[in-house]
Amino acid sequence: DKAKAFNKLGLNGFQISYEINSIKIELKKEVLENIDNLIICIPPSGFSNYDQIVGSIVTCFNAKTKIIFTSSTGVYEEINGEVTEDSNKTKDHPVFLAEQKLRELAVDRLTILRLAGLIGDNRHPVKYFIQKDLIPNCNAPVNLVCQKDVIRAIELILEKQLFSKTYNIVNPSHPSKKDYYMNASKALSNGNPKAEFGAGGKLVLGTKFEDEAGFKYNFPIDDWNELRKTNEYR
């Protein structure tokens, strides 16, 4: 159904099916070998061998295909303080393992985007806190980014051919979880979840991409009027 939806938009939508040790892509080999850019946006949930699946997809394409992999800022170790692309990672995190697999296969034509928590159309983490009626570790900073800014970042990477890179993609606004989610709950659902204090948390910096690509985040994470239009919270 999703492939058909892409086709209606004038795109070449096709299905990828997978088994434990194999990948099947419903597209002719000669088409795969002539694709210039591959963007991998597959979440790790539901996979016991996520790194192998992602690696197998890459091997279906030619050795010149440029790759953008949407990773996660969740790969960083839990610390109190600022985090950059060079900070310590959780070595057994499935997404970090996938990063390593892709580097083995395509290091010079691969760019990794470590995305912060995504907000956008019908997607906002405040839903979880409203359901639980609790904001844990409320003094930790939020690390979020709007989906539209992620799309803009990908477009800029393709335009400027910024490959063999790793970037954090995260909005520079980092209020505390308490301040942000209390305001979000009131603005979007008239909720009032309880705040639970904790040990603090990491503040992920995205300045490397801003500096190297000349990128500016256009979509604020606290535009409640816009978020109210595109989300249902009750």
Predicted regions and their residues:
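Conserved Rossmann-fold cofactor-binding substructure of NAD(P)-dependent oxidoreductases
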Residues: 7-35
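NAD(P)-cofactor binding segment of oxidoreductase domains
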Residues: 25-69, 97-101
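Conserved Rossmann-fold NAD(P)-dependent oxidoreductase catalytic core, especially the SDR/UDP-sugar
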Residues: 55-90
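Short-chain dehydrogenase/reductase
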Residues: 83-102, 140-145, 174
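Conserved beta-loop-beta element that borders a ligand/cofactor-binding pocket
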Residues: 100-121
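Substrate-positioning beta->alpha
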Residues: 112-118, 125-127, 134-158
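Mid/C-terminal beta-alpha module of Rossmann-like enzyme folds, strongest
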Residues: 151-206, 234
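Amphipathic terminal alpha-helices
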Residues: 221-234
